[in-house]
From Swiss-Prot:
GO terms for cellular component: cytoplasm; DNA-directed RNA polymerase complex. This is DNA-directed RNA polymerase subunit Rpo11. Part of the RNA polymerase complex. Belongs to the archaeal Rpo11/eukaryotic RPB11/RPC19 RNA polymerase subunit family. It is an enzyme of class 2 (transferase). It comes from Archaeoglobus fulgidus (strain ATCC 49558 / DSM 4304 / JCM 9628 / NBRC 100126 / VC-16). Pfam families: RNA_pol_L_2.
Length: 86
């Protein structure tokens, strides 16, 4: 996975996440939307074969990259919980 920052401000970020598809981006969006500091989290994959997946996050003033980190920590915790139950 390669992450590239396309645009960033105090309360928003637009990222390209190469090598990923709907599986990861939908999960990331899900956990971002659950964050009370996140106003908008949406992603787009322009074309499934050649498009680079993009995600846009807007927050209520907190660092948007911190929101992405928190969402990824929740994904890791959910995966660890699942692995413990197997």
């Amino acid at each position: 996975m390669e992450v590239k920052i396309i645009d960033i401000g105090e309360d928003y970020v637009r990222l390209v996440i190469k090598g990923e598809g709907h599986t990861y981006l939908n999960l990331l969006q899900h956990y971002l939307v659950e964050d009370e500091d996140v106003i908008v989290a949406r992603y787009n994959i322009p074309h499934p074969l050649i498009g680079e997946p993009e995600i846009y996050i807007k927050t209520s003033g907190v660092d948007p990259l911190e929101a992405v980190k928190r969402a990824n920590e929740k994904i890791i915790a959910a995966c660890n919980t699942l692995l413990e139950q197997l």
